[in-house]
C-alpha cells in the first residue's frame, strides 16, 4: 500500500499541500515533516480568516488529525517543535473563532487533555524553579552571613502566621483608635490621593483625600525595604504583609506609593476628560490574532501613566457577550453598593479572616512568592495592554525568510513567533524558563521541552471560549493527562547530581482514568505572580464555572471543585457576598475554596 504523500508530477509537486487559496484534507496525513509544516503554516492562516474552512475541519476529521499531532508530544528537534506549535495554533484558531458547534467539536475531539497537560507542566516548572531558587538563596545567605544564618533560618522556617494568641494581639493593635486628624491644605486636594483603607478594593477608582493615616500606610515602608535591603529584610516584609487580610494579593508598590499621599494619576482623576487615553486602556481586541495598530511614540510621562493596567472587571471583550466568556452579568465597576436580591447570602466578613491557623498556612504556602525569582509581567512593558499573537501568512513572504534562518532558537521557541512584526508586542520568555536557561548545568535538550508562555496563554483563552457551554462541563471535570506530553522526566533531570534516567514504559492513554479536573489547574493561574494576561483568561474560565445550566432548569453547581454538588432547585445555594457570582452549598465549601477564590473574587456593584 502506497504512502499518503500523494505526489502530483504534472504540477511538479512532491506531495499534496495546503495553500492560502486551496485546502486539501490529504495534506494533513503527510508523513514528511517539511511539507506538513508548510501545510500547517497555511492552514493557520485559513483557520484565522475563513469560517468555511473551520466548518470543513469539523466534518472531515481534520480536528482529530491535529489533536493526534499534538498528542505525539513535543520533540527536541526544531522541525518537530515547529510542527507541534503550528498544529496547536490551528486548533486554537478553530476554537476561538468558531461557532458553538465548531467549539463543541473541538472539545469532543479530545483537546481538553492536551490543554490540561500543558497547564500542569507549566505549574510543575514554576514549582521547580521556585524550589531551586529558595534553596540557592538559603545557601547564599548561609555562606555570606554565617553568624546570622540561624536568625535567617528562623525567619524563613517559621510559619507565615503566628499562633492564634499573637494573631489576636496583632488584629487588636490594628483596630485601635486612629491618631488625630491631619490638616491637609486646600491646594493638595487636587494633587494628592491617599490609599484606600478597604482591604478588598483592588480597582483603580477615584478616591477622596483622607483625614487620618490609613491602616496600611506601612506598606510604603515595607515596599521601600523590599527593594533596598537584603534578603533578611525581604523575608520579614513578606511575613508582615501576610498579616494583612488579603494584602498578599496586592503588589506592595501599587498599594501605596511613598509613605502616605501620592499624586493622582490622570486615568484615575479625569477619565471623562481624557477619552483617548481611557479608551486605549479599556480596549480589547477581537481575538489574540487581531494585529495592533501602528505604534505611536509617547513621552515618558505618558508611558508611565498608561502602564496602569485596568482590572479584570474593567476589561471587556469586543467579540460580544456570547464570546467573551465572562458569564452573565459581568461587572464593569467596583462600586461599594450592591443591589438587594432575594437569594440567601453566605455571610463572610469583608476581610474574610478565616480563623483556622492551618488554613492560613495553606493559603500563604499556595501563593508565596519566591525571593530569588523576579517575575516580570510582559504586558506591562509593552505598548499594547492585551494578549495579542499575530498570525502571519506566507503571502507577504516574510515568515519563511525570517523563520527558516532562525536555527539557533533558544529555549525551544518555535520559529512561528513573529518577532520581527512591529505591530505585535514581543512575548517575553517566562522568568522561570530564563532561570533555568541561565544555569549552565541544565541541558539544552531539557529546555526545549519546557512549556512556553504563549502556549499557556492560548490554552487559557481556548478554555475561556469553550468552557461556557454547560453541556460540555463533564469534559473539563473528568479529563486526564497525555503521557507523551508530560515533562516529569525532564524535571527529574534538573535535580542536582541526578543520573541519566532511563525512559519509563509509556502508558497507554486510553487506559488512563479520567480523574483530572481542569478547573483547579486553571485557578492556580489567577494568583498574582503570573502575568496579567494569564490572570485575565484564567478568571474568565473560573467565572464560566459559575454559569447556570439552562438545560437543567437554571440550576448551578457548587463552586468548590471537590464538592461539585448541584442544586435541586433554583437559588438553593448561597452566593458569595463579595462577587455574588460563585455559589456554595455550605460554609465549609466556601471556606475551603477561598484559598484561591480570593484571587478572582471581585466586588459586584
Curated annotation (Swiss-Prot):
Pfam families: zf-MYND
Zinc finger (MYND-type): 560-601
Keyword Lipoprotein: no
Keywords in alphabetical order: Cytoplasm, Metal-binding, Sporulation, Zinc, Zinc-finger
GO biological process, alphabetically ordered: establishment or maintenance of cell polarity; positive regulation of flocculation; sporulation resulting in formation of a cellular spore; ubiquitin-dependent protein catabolic process
Compositional bias annotation for Basic residues: 226-241
Extent of Polar residues compositional bias: 189-206, 279-306
Chain positions recorded as Zn(2+) binding sites: 576, 579, 597, 601
Annotated compartments: Cytoplasm
Record flagged with keyword Iron: no
One Gene Ontology term of the molecular function aspect: zinc ion binding
Primary site of residence: cytoplasm
Gene Ontology cellular-component terms listed: cytoplasm; MUB1-RAD6-UBR2 ubiquitin ligase complex
Region called Disordered, residue ranges: 133-241, 274-349
Protein family per UniProt: Belongs to the MUB1/samB family.
Protein purpose: Involved in determination of the onset of polarized growth and morphogenesis. Plays a role in the regulation of branching in hyphae and spore formation.
Name of the molecule in the record: MYND-type zinc finger protein samB
Organism: Aspergillus oryzae (strain ATCC 42149 / RIB 40) (Yellow koji mold)
Lineage summary: Eukaryota, Fungi, Dikarya, Ascomycota, Pezizomycotina
